[in-house]
Structure formats: C-alpha cells, structure tokens
Design a protein with these regions (language model features):
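Sequence signature of WD/YWTD-type beta-propeller architectures
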Residues: 1-256
Length: 256
C-alpha cells in the first residue's frame, strides 16, 4: 500500500519541502526532488504537526512514540536526536514565534483542547484560551503581533486571532463553513486556510474541501482551489518564503 503524503512545510530558503509519510518526516527538493528520510532519532511516530524555526536551524515535531500521547520535540534541521519540549500529553505543535523563542501548540489538559505556549528551551507552559470547545491550530503572524487559530466557540469552526499573551481574542471569519488551520503569509498580507462543509465534524480525510485565502487588508476571501483531501492537506505553515505560493496536499485536484 502506498503511504499518503501529508502536511508539507516549505523550507526557509525555498529549496525543499518537509512532509509526513507514515509517521516519518521526509525531505524533498522543490524541483525534481526525491524524498529522503529525515533522522528524527527515537521519534518515529510523528503526527502531521511540524514546522521549521525562523532561523531555519530546527524542526519542531509532534510525536507519539512514547506511550501516553503526542508530545512536542525539537530536532536539528539536518536530522539528529529529538529533544523533548512538552512533558504533558497530548501536545500538538503548530507555530514558532518570529524571534524563535516560543512554541505555540494545542494541548488537552482537562477535558478541553486549548492553545498553549512554551519556551523552546522547555519549562512552564502557558494556557492562552479558556473558551468551551476546541481551540486549535495556533500560528504566529510574521510581526509577532497576533496568534491566529481556529475555534468552535461560536458554533461552527472559525478563524480567530489573539495577542501572544492570549488577550484581545477576536473572530476573523464569520461564514457558514468550518474553517481550519490559518497560516499567515511571510509578508503579513494574507492568511490561507482550509474549509470544510458545515456538516463535517473535525478535519477528516476523503472530503471535498476548499483552500482559501483572506486579504488581511480588507478581509476579502477568495478560493485558491477546490480539492479532494482534508486530513493532512494543509496542517502546518506552508507558504513559500516569497509569499507567492502555498504547498498543500490534494488527493485529487478538482478546480481550478
């Protein structure tokens, strides 16, 4: 059976992608590349939640090799031993602060999944959201002013944003769909996110989904592609460094 590719990251220099296949992280050149397995030490059951540090030297991964659930680890970008960052589980990485000092992740600590941050050197985690229902997918704006995330608190899953300390939480999208995993562009002008139908619970595979972008200047949304995908299509930051392209996974491209 062919293992599905999912959750592509674009490297900081724009030369290669990192992606998940079968719980392992692979590296592939953007042009005519062949996938190469990245050494992640003992972390060999990776989830789709991973991303490259602003300086391009580290990869944050979410791995569940150790019993008890997913935890966040750091691995050298060239491969090597995985250093555990979060002690509590489950924890799913989603964002680096622009200065590279803080990681944002989704964690379940009671009966709720909420947004947390933690220093890259480890230590105490800080809970940022307390609303009832799932809060997920935190990713920093390139200027560090906001963390974008998705929340079901208003009924459907919608895109929200807040200050990095958790203050000033405000809704960004207000339509009749379920919107997940917003990622700001490197130039700070756009967010890209994946949209599911209003009757779809979670972000399952094998769905008709839409990839959309919002202009942060005027909040107008346009469709990039309609595709058959879902799980793993665009979990993690996947903009090209020049903000002109987005990497994503489609099981079968429908439009355009």
């Amino acid at each position: 059976m062919v293992k599905r590719v999912s959750a592509p990251n674009w490297s900081r220099d724009g030369k290669y992608f990192l992606f998940n296949r079968g719980g392992r992280i692979y590296k592939m050149a953007v042009t005519n590349g062949t996938p190469e397995l990245l050494d992640t030490g003992t972390a060999i059951k990776c989830n789709n939640d991973h991303g490259i540090s602003p300086d391009g030297k580290w990869l944050a991964i979410s791995d569940q090799t150790v019993p008890g659930g997913s935890r966040v680890y750091l691995v050298p970008i060239a491969g090597g031993a995985a250093r555990q960052i979060t002690s509590n589980a489950p924890s799913y990485w989603h964002g680096w602060s622009p200065d590279g000092k803080t990681l944002a992740f989704c964690g379940q600590r009671t009966n709720e999944f909420d947004i947390y941050t933690i220093p890259v050197d480890g230590g105490a985690e800080t809970r940022l959201t307390i609303a009832t229902g799932l809060d997920d997918g935190p990713d920093y704006s390139p200027d560090g002013e906001y963390i974008y995330f998705n929340s079901v608190r208003s009924g459907l899953m919608q895109i929200w944003r807040m200050k990095p300390d958790g203050s000033e939480q405000e809704q960004v999208t207000t339509d009749d769909y379920n919107n997940w995993f917003a990622h700001p562009s490197p130039d700070g002008k756009w967010i890209v996110f994946i949209t599911f139908a209003k009757d779809v619970v979670g972000h399952p595979a094998n769905q008709d989904v839409t990839l959309r972008v919002m202009s942060l200047a005027d909040k107008k949304i346009r469709v990039l592609a309609k595709l058959f995908g879902g799980q793993g299509t665009i979990y993690v930051p996947s903009w090209s460094p020049d903000s002109r392209n987005v990497a994503f996974v489609s099981y079968q491209l429908v439009y355009p």
